[in-house]
């Protein structure tokens, strides 16, 4: 909306440094209370006169004094793509998938500031550690997810060194949970970096062991295996996060899943090539996390949707064979576009009749859930 306002009020496109100045100044004018707006404008005009020129200061003064009125007119005109800084083609796709009313709600929430959530591992040791940090958090409606109170990052950050806590949106929990991982099982997480969903899978395995200790042997948890795969410069962060899991066997494998032979790499590392469950957190358009990644809305193109959908289909077809008979394949994205999500799940099911879709769900954003996306589980 700010860029649109500058376009309306400037007779010609300002130079880059003037664009940067105007964006910052207009943003401050917008959020200022009405009785403080004149002071904010005068401050920016004075700064421009001192650091640019008198003529440019006059230009800034003219733009800032008219920007609030221009923005209000834009809002009344219901130009959604301008108001919410979301490409019009994407808004039209959402209207097609979800209807106008639900799309309006999505747009509203995606433009609100993101929250920071800490996820706590589900065991008593984690709870005891957290007792010393509760004052820095607020509870959420999601079990084991706690919202960090503003201004408390420095106070809360030591939790991340313990191995019991991880920063992630509550929505990230839903897809890994569909694997229903069990202690003693073997699981494969593809496109795993930075490791948030691998950490969830590991905690789910641990929770199963703790909840059903009487039916497992003492060594069952340690015998569980989770192999997390990614490649290139994404590997180091994945390793750092998975090294904090000390209660079961976690391996990290460097493999370009579209270009290299994963089976060969697994065998070379002495790892199995058949798993009780495979999780694919596929590359996607990121349309479900525009609240968390606001820059993505300026980069995304409509062609990206189809390109991502094609990559996702290739991953599904290529790695379904790593699931044991009776096992589960979970496909997940952080997109809310049907072409990348339900259509891909249906495509896979149609072309692989020995697989059955057990769940297929799109998660839309809400006030307490920054992230959203899609997951589907298919059983062999």
Segments and roles (model prediction):
Residues 1-380:
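S-adenosylmethionine
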């Amino acid at each position: 909306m700010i860029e649109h306002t500058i376009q309306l009020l400037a007779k010609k496109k300002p130079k880059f440094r003037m664009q940067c100045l105007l964006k910052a100044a207009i943003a401050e004018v917008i959020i200022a209370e009405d009785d403080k707006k004149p002071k904010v404008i005068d401050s920016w005009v004075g700064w421009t006169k001192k650091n640019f020129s008198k003529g440019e200061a006059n230009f800034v003064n003219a733009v800032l004094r008219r920007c609030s009125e221009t923005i209000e007119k834009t809002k009344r005109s219901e130009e959604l793509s301008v108001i919410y800084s979301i490409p019009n083609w994407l808004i039209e796709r959402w209207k097609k998938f979800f209807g106008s009313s639900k799309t309006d709600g999505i747009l509203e929430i995606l433009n609100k500031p993101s929250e920071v959530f800490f996820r706590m591992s589900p065991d008593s040791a984690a709870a005891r550690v957290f007792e010393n940090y509760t004052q820095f958090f607020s509870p959420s409606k999601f079990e084991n997810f706690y919202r960090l109170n503003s201004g408390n990052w420095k106070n809360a950050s030591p939790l991340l060194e313990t191995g019991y806590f991880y920063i992630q949106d509550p929505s990230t929990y839903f897809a890994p949970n569909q694997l229903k991982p069990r202690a003693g099982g073997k699981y494969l997480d593809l496109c795993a970096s930075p490791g948030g969903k691998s950490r969830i899978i590991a905690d789910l395995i641990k929770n199963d062991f703790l909840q059903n200790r009487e039916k497992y042997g003492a060594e069952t948890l340690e015998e569980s295996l989770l192999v997390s795969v990614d490649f290139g410069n994404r590997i180091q962060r994945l390793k750092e996060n998975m090294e904090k899991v000390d209660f079961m066997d976690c391996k990290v494998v460097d493999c370009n899943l579209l270009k290299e032979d994963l089976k060969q790499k697994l065998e070379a590392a002495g790892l199995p090539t058949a798993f009780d469950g495979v999780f694919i957190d596929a590359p996607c358009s990121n349309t479900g996390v525009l609240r968390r990644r606001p820059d993505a809305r300026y980069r995304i193109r409509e062609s990206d949707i189809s390109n991502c959908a094609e990559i996702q289909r290739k991953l599904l077809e290529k790695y379904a064979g790593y699931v044991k008979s009776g096992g589960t394949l979970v496909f997940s994205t952080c997109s809310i576009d049907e072409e990348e999500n339900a259509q891909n799940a249906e495509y896979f099911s149609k072309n692989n009749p020995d697989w059955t879709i057990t769940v297929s769900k799109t998660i839309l954003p809400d006030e307490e859930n920054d992230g959203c996306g899609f997951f589907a589980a298919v059983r062999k």
